[in-house]
From Swiss-Prot:
This is Mitochondrial fission 1 protein. Signal peptide: none annotated. It is a single-pass membrane protein. It comes from Emericella nidulans (strain FGSC A4 / ATCC 38163 / CBS 112.46 / NRRL 194 / M139). Residues 1-127 are cytoplasmic.
Length: 153
């Protein structure tokens, strides 16, 4: 199943325009050492939606800070922590945060669609891993056979 079949997971593939992210960055930087939780959340959200890995990592870091320091904002952070980790390829972490959200909100369609994306990606990468291991085993067998054959002569 692709993300086009999962309208609620559209956030996974739709970055902000650079100018939109710059507005969030400017507000975050303007507030400096006294940045508000909402400003920090907004900036982290924009970073996670980015196509750039460094931005996504920074977004996850900022949301993790909010998650730890502001228990009243944890529910809001869960989806975007799951999404950020998904985009970074940290599927175990993505699943953990997403499952926490689903436990709190079993009817959350956004979290349900993200669960499907995570499961699909894990399956796909698992198959690629199996193919790589199989290819390596085949290559080792061929090399071993050639070496064995060479020793018999």
């Amino acid at each position: 199943m692709t993300s086009s079949n999962l309208p609620y997971a559209a956030d996974a593939e739709s970055p902000l325009k650079p100018a939109e992210l710059q507005v969030l960055r400017a507000q975050y930087e303007k507030e400096g050492d006294y940045v508000g939780v909402q400003t920090k959340f907004n900036y982290a959200w924009g970073l996670i939606k980015s196509n750039f890995r460094a931005d996504q990592q920074e977004g996850v870091r900022l949301l993790s800070e909010i998650f730890r320091a502001h228990p009243e904002r944890r529910r809001e952070c869960l989806f975007y922590l799951a999404l950020g980790n998904y985009k970074l390829g940290n599927y175990g972490e993505a699943r953990r945060y997403n499952d926490l959200l689903i436990d709190k909100e079993p009817g959350n369609l956004q979290a349900a669609s993200l669960r499907t994306l995570i499961d699909d990606r894990v399956s796909r990468e698992g198959m690629v891993g199996i193919a790589i291991v199989g290819g390596l085993a085949l290559a080792a067998g061929v090399v071993g056979g050639l070496l064995f054959r060479g020793q018999r002569r």
